[in-house]
Amino acid sequence: MNFGDITVVIVTFKSEHKIYSCIDSIPEESKIIIIENSNDTKFKQKIEAHRSNVECFLTMQNNGYAAGNNFGLKKVKTKFALVLNPDTRLLKNSLKEFYNTAAKNNDFWLIGPNQDFVNNVQNENTLEVDNIKGY
């Protein structure tokens, strides 16, 4: 398994107070692309200095979550991309499980995780669709 095959994309808007625990939960071998939907150059400098595997792009205005992800995903050069929110943290084996699932399944375009909520209750609802039009 090679964490270097994974780029994590995080879209944020002035979330400096939340994002460090997210970044610190990601192995240093993985590249991290942060899309900051503002013109906060101090944030960019601080976040890139925090970890050597972080690259931060400023959009200069809040273009929204979807546009931020589209922008970030275009910057990915690795085999796999993982989209995270700035207020999330990866559990110990999450990235390993993501990599193993992605590496052995060639017929996917999106993989979604189980989510642990308060009191470790998991959301195990699954929806399979042939076409995402209308969702």
What do these predicted regions represent?
Residues 12-28:
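Short, well-formed alpha-helical segments that are part of the catalytic scaffolds
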Residues 43-44, 69, 93-95:
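Acidic donor-diphosphate engagement hotspot in glycosyltransferases and nucleotidyltransferases
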Residues 93-125:
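Conserved donor NDP-sugar-binding/catalytic core segment of glycosyltransferases
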